[in-house]
């Protein structure tokens, strides 16, 4: 085992509630509420009912954990599976920039399901979630940009992040965490090819990551051993899944740098790679008083990661695929001033003006933007107007980034809108859930989070 893996597992084993700064605990609560809304917003939307039916067919008729979208009880495994699938559909879940990881969608489903199964408290859930974020983010940074080009990091690294969160609930020691990483890492999978075909694999990725991470933890607790150097070994994850791995990232400022607090919230209901350009275009249009009809063309200056992910989507075939179309997102921004769930579902595919605007949008690699990525996601657009002017828009921190974050009032508003979208809960129930999350540290059991 390398010194960096050992440092990480020792940190995870020793992490205690009292060591976590108050702002980090508060941000964990913020992220939890944000995740809860994302999961509930998917109720009734394809392909989530497929996962629900699978859980009903293969899982128990009852259990200690709760499936959020339908309120049914099940085992921790199947609750984690369905809740993680539903977390990653509406594209409103959080993102950590430099790891390009969506931690909430894998950490919270596994941690909540296991906490309900094990009878853990709100405080224990918070500590476990922090552990999952801190480990997952560092492993994502360790694997680097080359990993993300082919592999869906939230699927691969997410398996380990989920496993760590559950392992922390089970009070694993350093050796158990090492075995746990081995068993989670050997299951890590998830490829970007699905985007070309508008396939449903993205939800399968997160469902399996959360459930497989939980599986690894429960088996480790029962004595299953795992590879001791799964991250850096000769036939480990970096060897097979990365060309630019940096082992030092695994132990980067453990205990002083709280990576969870660097996590961004999503403001638009689309792939995060579209957000910088969307914000830059919106700012430019407001500043110059432009309408969509005033714009002849838009060139978005982006990083390579955006081209790798968004470049596969030319003419989107589904609402979900439209969330990965730069032109569609900017079309909604230009025409409606926002790219939320309502705009996507009502207009992304049906409004011909969106398609017309999409044809005006192109992406080009920008050295400044690419050099800053993934630590910073810069937004740069060049607009040619119908009357021949060339205008430039720029933002350095998209809405939702730590330096331009959402307040608790904005998070509550977002949560209510997400729940209202799917009608998964009434307004009163949504308010009660918000109150429960803000009292998370007081809860001795987590049955109320259902």
Residue ranges: model-predicted function:
Residues 83-141:
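Hydrophobic alpha-helical hairpins/lids featuring a short glycine-rich hinge
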Residues 115-215, 222, 227-229, 233-234:
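Glycine-rich, mobile lid/loop segments that gate access to catalytic sites or pores
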Residues 87, 106-108, 113, 135, ...:
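Short connector loops/turns at beta-strand edges and beta->alpha or beta->beta junctions
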Residues 25, 29, 33, 107, ...:
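Hydrophobic face of alpha-helices
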Residues 1-100, 196, 201-211, 218-450:
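Terminal-appendage/accessory-domain detector
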Residues 21, 32, 107-114, 156-169, ...:
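Alpha-helical scaffold elements that line and support the substrate/ligand-binding pocket
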């Amino acid at each position: 085992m390398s010194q960096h893996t050992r440092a990480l597992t020792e940190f995870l084993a020793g992490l205690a509630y009292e060591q976590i700064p108050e702002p980090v605990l508060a941000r964990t609560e913020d992220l939890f509420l944000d995740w809860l809304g994302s999961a509930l917003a998917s109720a009734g939307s394809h392909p989530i009912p497929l996962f629900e039916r699978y859980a009903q067919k293969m899982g128990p008729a009852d259990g200690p954990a709760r499936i959020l979208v339908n309120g049914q009880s099940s085992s921790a495994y199947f609750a984690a599976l369905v809740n993680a699938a539903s977390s990653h559909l509406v594209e409103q879940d959080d993102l950590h920039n430099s790891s390009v990881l969506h931690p909430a969608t894998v950490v919270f489903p596994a941690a909540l399901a296991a906490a309900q199964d094990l009878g853990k408290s709100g405080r224990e859930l918070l500590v476990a979630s922090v552990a999952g974020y801190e480990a997952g983010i560092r492993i994502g940074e360790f694997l680097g940009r080359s990993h993300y080009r082919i592999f869906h990091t939230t699927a691969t690294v997410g398996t380990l992040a989920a496993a760590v969160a559950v392992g922390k609930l089970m009070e694993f020691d350093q050796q158990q965490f090492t075995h746990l990483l081995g068993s989670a890492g050997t299951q890590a999978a998830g490829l970007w090819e699905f985007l070309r075909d508008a396939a449903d694999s993205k939800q399968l990725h997160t469902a399996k990551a959360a459930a497989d991470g939980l599986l690894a933890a429960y088996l480790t607790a029962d004595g299953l051993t795992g590879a001791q150097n799964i991250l850096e070994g000769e036939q480990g994850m970096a060897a097979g899944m990365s060309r630019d791995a940096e082992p030092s990232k695994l132990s980067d400022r453990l205990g002083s740098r709280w990576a969870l607090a660097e996590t961004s919230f999503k403001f638009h209901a689309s792939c995060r790679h579209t957000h910088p350009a969307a914000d830059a275009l919106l700012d430019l249009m407001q500043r110059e008083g432009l309408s969509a009809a005033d714009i002849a063309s838009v060139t978005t200056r982006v990083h390579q990661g955006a081209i790798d992910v968004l470049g596969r989507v030319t003419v989107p075939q589904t609402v979900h695929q439209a969330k990965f179309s730069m032109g569609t997102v900017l079309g909604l921004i230009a025409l409606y001033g926002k790219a939320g769930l309502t705009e996507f579902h009502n207009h992304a595919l049906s409004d011909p003006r969106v398609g017309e605007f999409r044809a005006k949008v192109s992406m080009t690699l920008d050295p400044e933007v690419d050099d800053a990525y993934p630590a910073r996601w810069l937004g740069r657009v060049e607009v040619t107007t119908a009357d021949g002017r060339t205008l430039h828009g720029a933002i350095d921190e998209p809405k939702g980034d730590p330096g331009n974050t959402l307040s608790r009032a904005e998070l509550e508003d977002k949560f209510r809108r997400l729940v209202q979208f799917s009608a998964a809960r009434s307004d009163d129930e949504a308010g009660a859930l918000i109150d429960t999350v803000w009292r998370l540290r007081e809860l001795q059991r987590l049955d109320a989070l259902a």
